[in-house]
Design a protein with these regions (language model features):
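A short helix-turn-beta junction within AAA+ P-loop NTPase domains corresponding to the substrate/partner-engaging
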Residues: 78, 153-168
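Walker A/P-loop
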Residues: 2-14, 45-84, 98-101, 130-135
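Conserved AAA+ ATPase "SRH/arginine-finger" region at the nucleotide-binding site
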Residues: 84-86, 161-174
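Short glycine-rich substrate-engagement loop in P-loop NTPases that contacts/grips substrate
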Residues: 36-41, 78-112, 122-123
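C-terminal helical "lid" of AAA+/P-loop NTPase domains
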Residues: 201-206, 212-227, 234-241, 259-263, ...
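A short, basic N-terminal segment
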Residues: 1-49
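Conserved AAA+ ATPase "sensor/coupling" helix adjacent to the nucleotide-binding pocket
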Residues: 97, 159, 175-189
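Conserved catalytic/switch belt of AAA+ P-loop NTPases
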Residues: 44-48, 115, 119-158
């Protein structure tokens, strides 16, 4: 795998969050998305043949979009490049296209470009991608939490195969948490923490279908324990506070977060206000809406 960031992977993973360390390396290890990436799915068959088409993965936070892209990066013989939608402009896209053409011409090697949060690209940036996807200069894998029919230009959308991922159910998240607890190399297994299934279900409930949020919460909760310690429901409740809210700009979760933000300001709670403000900004909310 080629990356824009050439860091020693082992050193990086020592300090990476639990959610990052526990990312599946094989498609068969992806939990809760059997319809999208199960053994008989279109995508699984194309990945096995190393013939990944341009696709758009869409679904709520923590459902496995980046994980699936990472699995493809681990398996493919193609050059794999991550592009940051918030930090890349038209020049970076054109430079990448030139590099992809050279890779194909001189090394007969395809380039796969992964753009996380592709909805953050404006119309001009999305338009620039179109001819390169169309003529096969590179294969595009986009990921978004937003409704692609509203956030992605129709011409580009028509060139991508849409793969919808669902929010993970409680059992799927519990399975992911159990893996993290038992894994001695990448997870928490060497610490010997004791976390009962009811407590794991509480963690899953707090996370609202977001596996990354669940793993982050588990990591924070167990960090307070001694080795071989037991995480109790009481300790988890004290740490977790309110149930984690999702955020969608045009749906119910959007108004939940906005309401919580307003209430925290009225209640003179700066920490809570900053938390909900950060969530809105991170989710792409327009500053003009927030300022109102």
């Amino acid at each position: 795998m080629d990356s824009l960031f050439d860091l020693d992977q082992n050193d990086h993973m020592k300090f990476a969050p639990l959610a990052e360390r526990m990312r599946p390396k094989k498609l068969s290890d992806v939990v809760g998305q059997e319809l999208a990436v199960g053994p008989n799915s279109f995508l699984a068959k194309m990945i096995q043949k190393d013939m990944v088409p341009s696709i758009l993965l869409f679904g709520p936070p923590g459902c496995g979009k980046t994980t699936i892209a990472t699995v493809i990066a681990n398996i493919t013989k193609s050059k794999f490049v991550k592009l940051n939608a918030t930090a890349s402009g038209i020049k970076e896209i054109r430079d990448l296209a030139k590099s992809a053409k050279d890779e194909l011409q001189f090394y007969q090697r395809r380039t796969i470009v992964f753009v996380d949060e592709i909805h953050r690209f404006n119309k001009g940036q999305q338009d620039i991608l179109l001819p390169y996807v169309e003529d096969g200069t590179f294969i595009l894998i986009g990921a978004t939490t937003e409704n692609p029919y509203f956030e992605i230009n129709a011409p580009l959308l028509s060139r991508l195969r849409l793969i919808r991922l669902k929010a993970l159910d409680e059992e799927s998240i519990v399975e992911i948490l159990e893996r993290a607890l038992n894994d001695r190399e990448r997870g928490l297994g060497k610490h010997g923490y004791h976390v009962s299934r009811p407590v794991l279900k509480m963690v899953a409930s707090y996370a609202s279908g977001d596996s990354r949020a669940a793993l982050n919460l588990l990591e924070q909760a167990t960090a307070l324990l001694e080795d071989n310690g037991t995480l109790t429901e009481k300790e988890l409740k004290e740490l977790a506070g309110e149930k984690i809210l999702n955020y969608d700009k045009n749906g119910d979760y959007h108004y939940d977060v906005v309401s919580a933000f307003i209430k925290s300001m009225r209640g003179s709670d700066p920490d809570a206000a900053l938390h909900y403000l950060a969530r809105m900004i991170n989710s792409g909310e327009k500053p003009s809406f927030i300022s109102r």
